[in-house]
A protein has these predicted regions:
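A detector of short terminal or domain-flanking linear segments
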Residues: 1-27, 34-35
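Charged, low-complexity intrinsically disordered terminal regions and linker tails
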Residues: 1-5, 45, 56-57
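Short, positively charged interaction helices/loops
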Residues: 6, 41, 64-67
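Short, contiguous, helix-prone interaction/anchoring segments in small proteins
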Residues: 22-53
Length: 67
């Protein structure tokens, strides 16, 4: 099952979050402004998490929204 099928099936938020957090890690490259990256790194440190964890959390939060 993929993300689209999960949403169309009316899966509950816990199942969606579990699906998004599971799977093997893969490396990606994104281009963002340096100020955005530096600010996000600082924010992550203040929250006791890594930059990567902050990005993953933000992506999961956006994908959990039901528009």
């Amino acid at each position: 099952m993929n993300y689209r099928e999960l949403i169309k099936s009316g899966a509950d938020p816990t199942d969606i979050q579990r699906f998004l957090a599971d799977g093997e890690m893969t490396a990606i490259t994104i281009r963002i402004p340096k100020n955005l990256r530096d600010s996000a790194k600082e924010a992550a440190e203040l929250r006791g998490m890594s930059f990567s964890a902050l990005v993953r959390a933000g992506l999961i939060q956006q994908l959990m929204k039901r528009d």
